[in-house]
């Protein structure tokens, strides 16, 4: 170590002296006042009382602690000029002079320092000792301060623990007293706990009610959804079932129609082959017939000679003359339109009736499917349709618009009818023909077997196509019911009531018997209304004025048939009339016509009613509501003859009349109308029993076998 100068040594010495004097004074003060004395701090008497306050304690006003400066500032302090007035060295009331044995080195003045600086003495270990003592002193002071703080905190914790012990002891004593007094719980606590439990229970009930309400709502929604699901499923199943049944029913109907069509086609082919053989036989007598026709059709009046070159020869040029068999007397009377090869109908179209008729085409629905038949070819709609024979042997060929198809059991099936926007009975043309033709033909007002309440039902059923005509079973004919329209009661096969009609398809509907004359009246009326329904339903259409005229001529033909049915007669060609006088003796007797019926025909007549019935409860050539079977029954069957309802096109180039084919026990006529060039013409084949009545001079009927 380098030696300190004399001045510095003196200053350090003074500082140590002052520090030691201060320490001695501090210790003396604390020993006297018993403050922070080890003897007084640790061994404290048991009766010592302190404040229970846990907060920081304030110092007593009379206890002033003097803090000494750190030894780190000794050098700075030494450079300063100490002032004796700045520090009180007294401890309490005792002056500092009584305790200080050494002078405070910090109070050394500069003069003394200057004096001592001149001292030549040197203490090399004094500085290190002073530094060590200073460090120890500071450590002791810090330890003392830490111990004092810990002591104060411990005393406070002790006081708090003692207070807690006292409170717990008091509570324990109280609980023991309650237990000794059998007071296990307080009423206030019980009430408070019960109140809490009640509140919790109410809250639980409210929550449970909310949950139950939600549960019921969910269950109700689930039930509703389940019911709706099952209902929808049931609807779908029912709809699918109905659709399946409809499809199956339609398939069955289509199969039946296909089968019936095949059978009908086979029957047509067989009959066509037979007709071809008949035509070959008819060509043999063609030359004789041409000669007879030319001779018999020459008029005797001058006017007739003027008309002959203009009308009749031209018709003979365009159409083949009627071919007659050697027995020309068997041509029966009929409407003039039944001989299209001899007569051309000319109808006026500038009358109000024609305008009313044209209104039917305008009223027909535009949505109806087009008919394959031409407008006027009404007779060609029922090709090869054969009627059942009656008990008197009067079979009739159908010229109705029914497009019949024969099923395997002999019945006829037809498609469903198409409805129109306006009923037929509301049209002006129907009201006209009802008053002019239908009512005069039927004469329901004078019918003895029909009440005035039933007359309207009969007319409505004829108009709507629901009238059913069926043969009378042979077992019922013996009772001899009178005709419901004319009241005829005469016995015999010619006047026998062979058919009956009812106004609906119901089995419980009342049946009204018909004689031969009235049967033809009903059939002609029904056929006429059936053709009007075909027009109104759109199955017969007129694209131009020519087709409208053709349809008008067809209605005239049907109205003429009603006229001849109520008259009970018809027309025949003049050559047939001339030959009828020559062969009058060979005419069949009307009253003995039943003897002319063959064994096979008699078997058919003796058959039960089911053999005559069709699926529509025994329609006799179908009075039904179908598209093609709407029309009434057909065939011209009157007392004076059976007509052949031809419809020949005015443009036909070939029209041939069938040859009469005689059977062993009956007479049947097969008629063929064929056209080669006109696309509108339709081959029409009909079969009917031909009856010819001739009276001898003595008034008796003769039979021709």
From Swiss-Prot:
> May I have one GO cellular component term?
cell tip
Q: What is this protein's function?
A: Guanine nucleotide exchange factor that plays an important role in regulating the growth and virulence, probably by regulating the autophagy pathway. Affects the sensitivity to cell wall disruptors and the cell wall thickness by regulating the expression levels of the cell wall integrity (CWI) pathway genes, thus coordinating the growth and virulence. Positively regulates the autophagy pathway to enhance the expression of CWI pathway genes in the presence of autophagy inducers.
Domain of life, per lineage: Eukaryota
Record family assignment:
Belongs to the SEC2 family.
**Annotated knockout phenotype:** Leads to slower growth and reduces the fungal burden and mortality of infected mice. Significlantly up-regulates the expression of atg1 and atg12 and accumulates more autophagosomes. Leads to down-regulation of CWI pathway genes including the chitin synthase genes chsB and chsC, the alpha-1,3-glucan synthase genes ags1 and ags3, the beta-1,3-glucan synthase gene fksA, and 1-3-beta-glucan glucosyltransferase gene gel1; but not chsA, chsG and gel2.
What is the scientific name of the source organism? Aspergillus fumigatus (strain ATCC MYA-4609 / CBS 101355 / FGSC A1100 / Af293)
Give the SUPFAM superfamilies listed for this entry: Sec2 N-terminal region
UniProt feature coiled coil, ranges: 144-285
Which gene holds the coding sequence for this protein?
sec2
Alphabetically ordered keywords of this record = Coiled coil, Guanine-nucleotide releasing factor, Phosphoprotein, Protein transport, Transport, Virulence
Q: Which GO terms describe its molecular function?
A: guanyl-nucleotide exchange factor activity
Please identify the protein, giving its name as recorded. Rab guanine nucleotide exchange factor sec2
């Amino acid at each position: 170590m380098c030696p300190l100068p004399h001045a510095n040594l003196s200053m350090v010495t003074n500082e140590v002296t002052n520090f030691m004097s201060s320490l001695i004074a501090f210790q003396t003060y604390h020993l006297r006042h018993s403050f922070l004395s080890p003897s007084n701090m640790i061994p404290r008497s048991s009766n010592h009382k302190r404040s229970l306050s846990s907060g920081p304690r304030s110092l007593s006003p009379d206890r002033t602690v003097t803090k000494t400066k750190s030894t780190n500032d000794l050098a700075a302090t030494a450079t300063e000029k100490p002032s004796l007035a700045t520090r009180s060295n007294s401890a309490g009331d005792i002056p500092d002079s009584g305790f200080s044995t050494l002078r405070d080195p910090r109070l050394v003045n500069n003069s003394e320092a200057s004096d001592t600086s001149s001292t030549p003495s040197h203490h090399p270990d004094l500085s290190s000792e002073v530094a060590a003592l200073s460090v120890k002193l500071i450590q002791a002071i810090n330890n003392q301060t830490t111990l004092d703080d810990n002591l104060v905190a411990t005393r406070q914790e002790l006081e708090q623990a003692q207070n807690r012990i006292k409170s717990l002891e008091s509570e324990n004593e109280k609980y023991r007293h309650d237990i000794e007094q059998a007071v296990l719980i307080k009423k206030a606590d019980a009430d408070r706990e019960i109140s809490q439990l009640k509140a919790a229970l109410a809250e639980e009930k409210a929550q449970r009610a909310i949950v139950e309400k939600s549960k019921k709502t969910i269950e109700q929604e689930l039930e509703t959804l389940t019911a709706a699901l099952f209902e929808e499923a049931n609807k779908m199943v029912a709809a699918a079932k109905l659709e399946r049944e409809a499809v199956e029913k339609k398939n069955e109907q289509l199969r039946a129609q296909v089968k019936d069509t095949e059978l009908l086609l086979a029957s047509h082919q067989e009959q066509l082959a037979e007709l071809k053989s008949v035509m070959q036989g008819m060509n043999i007598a063609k030359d004789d017939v041409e000669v007879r026709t030319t001779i018999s059709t020459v008029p005797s009046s001058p006017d007739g000679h003027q008309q002959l070159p203009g009308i009749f020869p031209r018709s003979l040029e365009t159409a083949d003359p009627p071919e007659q068999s050697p027995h020309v007397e068997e041509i029966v009377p009929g409407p003039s339109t039944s001989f299209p090869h001899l007569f051309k109908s000319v109808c006026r179209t500038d009358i109000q009736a024609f305008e009313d008729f044209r209104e039917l085409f305008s009223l027909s629905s535009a949505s109806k499917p087009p008919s394959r038949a031409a407008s006027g070819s009404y007779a060609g709609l029922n090709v090869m349709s054969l009627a059942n024979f009656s008990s008197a042997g009067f079979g009739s060929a159908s010229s109705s618009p029914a497009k019949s198809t024969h099923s395997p059991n002999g019945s006829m099936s037809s498609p469903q009818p198409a409805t129109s926007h306006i009923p037929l009975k509301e049209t002006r043309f129907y009201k006209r023909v009802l008053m002019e033709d239908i009512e005069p033909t039927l004469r329901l007002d004078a019918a003895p077997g029909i009440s005035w309440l039933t007359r309207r039902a009969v007319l409505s059923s004829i108009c709507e196509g629901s009238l059913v005509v069926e043969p009378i079973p042979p077992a019922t004919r013996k009772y001899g019911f009178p005709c419901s329209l004319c009241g005829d009661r005469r016995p015999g096969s010619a006047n026998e009531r062979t058919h009956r009609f009812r106004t609906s398809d119901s089995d419980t509907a009342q049946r009204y018997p018909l004689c031969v004359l009235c049967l033809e009246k009903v059939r002609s009326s029904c056929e006429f209304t059936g053709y009007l329904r075909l027009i109104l339903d759109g199955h017969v259409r007129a694209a131009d004025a020519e087709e409208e005229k053709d349809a008008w001529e067809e209605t005239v033909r049907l109205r003429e048939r009603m006229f001849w049915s109520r008259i009970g007669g018809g027309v025949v060609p003049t050559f047939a009339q001339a030959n009828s006088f020559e062969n009058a003796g060979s005419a069949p007797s009307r009253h003995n016509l039943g003897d002319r019926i063959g064994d096979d025909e008699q078997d058919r007549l003796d058959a039960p009613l089911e053999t005559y019935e069709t699926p529509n409860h025994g329609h006799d050539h179908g009075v039904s509501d179908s598209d093609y079977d709407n029309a009434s029954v057909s065939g011209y069957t009157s007392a004076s003859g059976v007509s052949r309802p031809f419809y020949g096109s005015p443009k036909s180039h070939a029209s041939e009349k069938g040859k009469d084919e005689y059977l062993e026990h009956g007479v049947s006529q097969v008629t063929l109308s064929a056209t080669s060039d006109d696309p509108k013409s339709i081959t029409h084949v009909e079969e009917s029993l031909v009856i010819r009545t001739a009276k001898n001079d003595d008034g008796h009927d003769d039979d021709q076998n």
